[in-house]
Amino acid sequence: MHIPESIHALICFGARPGEGNPALVVEGGDPSPQARQRLARGRNTTCVFIDEDGDGTVRVDYWYPHMRSPLCLHATLAVAAVLFRRTPDAEVIAVETAMHGQRLALLRDGDDYFVRLAAQAVPQVDVTAAQAAALLGTAPVSPPRLASVGSPKLLVEVRDAAALYALQPDLAWIAAWSRQHGINGIYAWYRCEDGVYEGRNFNHLDPALEDAATGVAAGALTIALGRSLVLYQGRAVGGDCLIRTRIDGPALLVGGAAAFA
């Protein structure tokens, strides 16, 4: 018998109240992969399912409308908001990803939530500037890089905001190339000023589902640049999102706002 399903709707990484990337946190319900994919596709929204084992381990299972994902940080912020509401006196809440058993620490700082995690291995793929330009439709201004905090990203720097928002790549081609190489899409970004960046994520097949905020890309960019950063995202989809990262010894923190919708 399944535990009755409870669904929480949240918006995450919003730069202002009412803004953010939507996610559904699901407790209980049918745990089969087919049911989870069906729910994510039916709601047309990123879903994260919370599973609690008898030993107290909390596992998080991420599903996009078109595929399962090893890690999604805006959905993890949503999980943090749900779990801290349940246990408001907790200082740190530990969870584990369902696909790869990656351990994540959830923290709260005022009205914001952070995920502490570490750099992960990336596929051994040599991506040339010409290949990146063909995939994205514009020439990168620095060598493309691969980095990961649990969901490998190809990071491609573009010239400026105009170049970033002119991008209209072939999403099906990016998805096929990503599957072939074990990479979860392309993150295009540019430098606004010292320590401040703006980007767009190309991972979903449907352009209407472009992320307003991509925490795993912010983490990957932090690793690639070797510095803490402030990252804006979402203007392409009418949103206004803000992701903050901090290097924390051998780990890093990725966080921002999470609010119940």
Where are these regions (language model features)?
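A short glycine/serine-rich beta->alpha loop
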Residues: C12-A15, D61-P70, H204-D211
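Conserved phosphate-donor
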Residues: R43-V58, W173-P207, Y232-A257
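ATP-binding N-lobe of GHMP and related small-molecule kinases
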Residues: M1-Y62, V149, A251, G255
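Hydrophobic anchor at the start of a short beta-strand
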Residues: E5-I7, C47-V48, P144, I186, ...
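Short, surface-exposed beta-edge/turn micro-motifs
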Residues: N21-P22, T45-T46, S151-K153, I183-I186, ...
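Acidic, low-complexity central loop/insert segments
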Residues: W63-A175, A213, A217-A261
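Conserved hydrophobic/aromatic beta-strand scaffold that supports enzyme active sites
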Residues: V25, F49, F114, K153-L155, ...
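Alpha-helix C-cap/termination motif
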Residues: G42, R86, Q180-H181, A224
